[in-house]
Each structure stands twice: as structure tokens, then as C-alpha cells.
Regions:
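A well-ordered secondary-structure block
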Residues: 101-119
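Short helix C-cap/helix-to-loop transition motifs enriched in small/turn-promoting residues
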Residues: 80-87, 111-112
């Protein structure tokens, strides 16, 4: 996990962090053929650990990779005890298929989300 701080002209601090969540998926969900799904206990441990890391970072914007299920990211964020206005994982609202997605967790208002998949 890598935090970065930006100070704008108004002397306002914005903290941005990025993290690879290593196949964050709901329990009992098969995400790769050669990988066993998370058992409920493993899922809980992973989300608790991620929540603790998110709390430590306390970022205004958190960009994450390897999310299979939007609900799994939402749960991990809740474990942090922090309040975010948006937890977004375009393409994984009902579970990503074939490949994990990226997510955005932010305290800033989000007006619109547009996924670019033509590459």
C-alpha cells in the first residue's frame, strides 16, 4: 500500500493511496479454476486485515486492484471504521467474470463513472 499526499493552492491536503488486494472475492466464490475459494473465516480475516490497513492509511482516495466482488470491497472498507461517500468497482457489481477489476474508494463526491474497455 502506497500513500501519496498532495497540497493544492488553498493549502488543502489530499491523501491518495493505492493497493493491490490480491484477489479480493466473496467467500465460497470461485474466481480462478486453479485457486480454492476463500472460506468464510479466511474472508473475514482478509477483510479485517484490509480494513486495518485502510484505517492506517486514512486516505481521501484509495485506488485498488484485483477486486472480484464490489460487496467484498465494501465490506473491507466498513471494517476500517472510516466513512467514504463512494466505493466503486465498475464491472464487479454482480461479480467480475474472467478477470478482476479495479476499484475506487473516495470521500470526494463522484458525479459519474465511465468504464473504458476498448483496449
Amino acid at each position: 500500500m502506497c500513500p501519496m499526499q498532495i497540497i493544492n493552492d488553498n493549502n488543502t491536503l489530499l491523501t491518495v493511496a493505492t493497493a493491490n488486494l490480491l484477489n479480493l472475492a466473496l467467500p465460497n466464490r470461485s474466481y480462478y479454476e486453479n485457486r480454492d475459494p476463500y472460506k468464510p473465516v479466511q474472508y473475514e480475516e482478509k477483510c479485517n486485515w484490509l480494513g486495518a490497513q485502510f484505517a492506517r492509511l486514512d486516505a481521501d482516495v484509495l485506488a485498488v486492484q484485483e477486486v472480484w466482488d464490489a460487496d467484498a470491497l465494501k465490506y473491507a472498507v466498513r471494517q476500517s471504521g472510516l466513512h467514504y461517500s463512494s466505493v466503486l468497482v465498475p464491472g464487479a457489481e454482480n461479480g467480475a467474470q474472467g478477470t478482476p477489476r479495479v476499484g475506487l474508494v473516495t470521500r470526494l463526491p463522484v458525479k459519474q463513472v465511465h468504464s473504458i474497455d476498448l483496449f
